Amino acid sequence: MQTGSEKQAPFDADYFRQHTDEYTIVDVRNTSEVKKKPIFHHAINIPLPELRLRLKEIPLDKPIAVHCAGGYRSAAASSILEAALPDNLEITDIGEHIKSF
């Protein structure tokens, strides 16, 4: 979902699907949701309510893709990350596309 931020990148689902290893994927669903239905096995699970406290767990060496189950939490998480992380870091909210994975 584009928010108008300069840090948001357009999302190319086909490219992402083939190159997930090029991204740090942050899954902001609750831990119980992730255990029940993992989507990306190499994703970092940081539930949205814990995100501000656990920012240091997110590597900054790759673009960041943020997702939840449907888009609401990932939009909020993307805004938090955009405000807290370096300006040159690409952050993409893939929440609205997650059901295609």
Show which residues each predicted segment covers.
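Rhodanese-like catalytic fold shared by cysteine-dependent sulfurtransferases
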Residues: 1-24, 28-101
